């Protein structure tokens, strides 16, 4: 999505990204976008900002990190990372565990453009071993919304006070 929006062909991905998620990213990006690893700071566990600055090119569509990370630490430099991406014409993409959003700031508060994650931690039933699903959210801007027009759902008030209806937009 970031590549289509920015018309660029690479994403910077912190090297602490979960291995399974990284495999999925490589699968989706194969032949379309290259993934460039960015080192993490061994003291804080966060993204190495100096390495990130060195890896940016005119081809960089997005910077991706997870919060909390696969290794369990919080990325405290989210706003700085997002500002760096935006200053260079890129997007900030954050992978989250939805359970964590009850206690840490949501990625939109520190500048994320695209947020994604796995819904399995929310207690999705295993249905014969296959109960997997994910979510994606973006800024409420046309350039993002137009990336998934057939998957857009909205909410609206109904005739009953306090009741909401849901449906395709």
Model-assigned labels for residue ranges:
Residues 13-68, 72-73, 80:
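PLP-dependent aminotransferase-class I/II
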Residues 19-21, 44-45, 70-74, 99-104, ...:
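Flexible loop/turn segments at secondary-structure boundaries
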Residues 14, 38-41, 63-66, 91-96, ...:
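Generic beta-strand/beta-sheet core signal
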Residues 5-10, 59-62, 84-90:
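Short, surface-exposed connector motifs at secondary-structure boundaries
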Residues 122-169:
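Active-site C-terminal subdomain of aminotransferase-like
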Residues 74-114:
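Catalytic PLP-binding core of fold-type I/II PLP enzymes
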Residues 1-8, 134:
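Conserved beta-loop-alpha segment that forms the PLP phosphate-binding cup at the N-terminus of a helix
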Residues 28, 81, 110-111, 130-135:
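Short secondary-structure boundary/capping segments
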